[in-house]
Amino acid sequence: MNKTIRRVVVFAGVLLVVLLLNLTWVQVIHAPELRNHPRNFARTQLTQFGRQRGQITADGVVLASSHYDEATKKFHRVYGKNADMWSPITGYFSLYSRSGIEYAEDAILSGQDDKLFGDRVIDLFTGRDPRGGNVALTIKPDMQEAAWNALQTGVGAGPLVGGVVAIQPSTGAILALASSPSYDPTPLASFSNTAVNNYDEQLRAMRPSPLINRATAEPLPPGSTFKVVTTAALLRKGVNANTYVSNAPRTILPDTVTPLENYGGEYCGGSTFGMAFAYSCNVPFADLSRKLTVREFQHTAESFGIGETYDIGVNEMASTIGDIPDAAALAQSAIGQRNVALTPLQNAIIAATIANNGVRMKPYLVEAETAQDLSVLYEAKPKELNRAISEKVAKQLTKLMITAEQYAGGANTLTVPVASKTGTAEHGTDSKNSIPYTWYIAFVPGHDVAVAVMIEGGAGVNRGSVGATVAGPVGRAVLKAALGQPTPKSVTPSYPRSPNYQPTATATYSTTVTQNNQGNNQGNGGTGSGTARNGNGGTNTEGDDGE
């Protein structure tokens, strides 16, 4: 072979190697990015409609499944009974986008996850139609239904606008996650572009928006529920239930002439910190905040997870305490006002951490992933994040919260003691004439469940609404469902069980405490949003029940 031919052969060989390397790059390494590119999204979705997508279940209840449509020769996504009750969790799967668990677990549900590689190879050689895996959630349907029914019943006048989250303190498993108003994801799964677009436009135009997940993606001023965080910081500094405090109706913010008042500008509670906590008096908390440095206050908030997101599989926004430039801002923040803004998820984590003797567990929504043959691909394991507070402080807080439940002004219809804190947060530029955000966080000592409720409005809610009479009944309904007690307006669940249902031991809800007591909205034009609406910096009152 002469020199010229040899050069041509070498050059051709190099080109072949480059071609193979480029092919490997495009087909293997770069493939996921190309597949998920917005311009390829609709084409990828159409391909997925050609295979059977996996089920989403909760304790055996089928929330989402795929049915073969003879007319279109494609698999149609079908959502189960009360789909609007579940859509803040499941999200939707459409031609243009996905959200919620449908997005977060898409690789498993579509069968594209590496954990299902063996199944894909078998399908290739056997000629079996490719199928996706299944996702089992930690949600308990009876608790979810209790939360949803309570939100729809409200104060007797109609549906409320708000969110609910219940957590198992010992594991972090999310037992209920409800948001109202909500939407039916079924029309978004239509094969008709026109139908999907029309429904999407209707949802976007609705007010209050059903697309906001108020349980996880709308941080709002928590009012007096935040006093449990402030109290944790104060207890660390030596304050206790018998510490003397003023019951004066107002105080002056440090280094200012600005007054801060109790709810209604009234004398509040007795002369001890324990009674000030029970009656949710603002003045003692503002005065005692002088004992704390800004960093100590921030550290306590951070230890409870404020500022974090948890990647649970639905759209989330981080809670915040905002900037605290001086002692006056610290006093306002200490009562859950100014720029403090929490989600029900974060407030539920705070309650669960106290119930778990001060240990914060990572919240999770996915209990297990399985292949079509029910072989387990993934099983959730509880994960301890940190010790937020000492066991001693947790027990002190529990006692204070049990007393607060007794003085809150709402009726405890449970047959066991409840540890709780209510909140009624003013907000906006005209806070005195705005409907307050009402809150309730609670847990049942000796039982492995904690709950947080936020109500921002709805039928029958007005400027005089308070936490115990609006949010409190919703939270207690969820706790009653957790304990197996009858709940108002509830019905016996009649959901169809998955034929593949097999109970698992992982994150199984129990009403007995263990010894240690331990959204995502993606795609082109995706539906869904999250907002943060913090309290007005000049708001200096915060109200609670019985004040």
Can you describe what each PLM-predicted range is?
Residues N149, Y407, T504-T506, T531:
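Residue-level detector of intrinsically disordered, flexible termini
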Residues I174-S224, V229-G457, G467, V513, ...:
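Beta-lactam-recognizing serine transpeptidase/beta-lactamase-like catalytic domain environment
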Residues P496, N500-S510, T514:
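Ser/Thr-rich, Proline-interspersed low-complexity disordered segments
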Residues M1-A195, P219-P221, R295-S303, V461-P496, ...:
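Periplasmic/cell-envelope proteins involved in peptidoglycan metabolism and beta-lactam response
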